[in-house]
Amino acid sequence: MRLDKYLKVSRIIKRRTVAKEASEGGRVTINGKAAKPSSEVKPGDVLEIRFGEKMARYRIVSVAETVRKENAAAMYELLGGEEIE
């Protein structure tokens, strides 16, 4: 699944356009490497996302095309940093 779509479906970032801008701006890495919006993600990958002055690390647990809002948090595991809504 594309990175920008995963960030939106998992609700780590609420809108796909914002997810795309974040990755184009160099604020998202996959397994320590800079990521483009079209980068593919899979279970086990570690995402690092900079939100202003804060950094959050997530491990991808599952990938699904659609998911209910209440189940979205089960798609990832927060590894560290501070979660931003």
Regions found by a protein language model. Name each.
Residues M1-R11:
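Extended boundary segments
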Residues K5, R16-E21, R27-E85:
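Strongly charged
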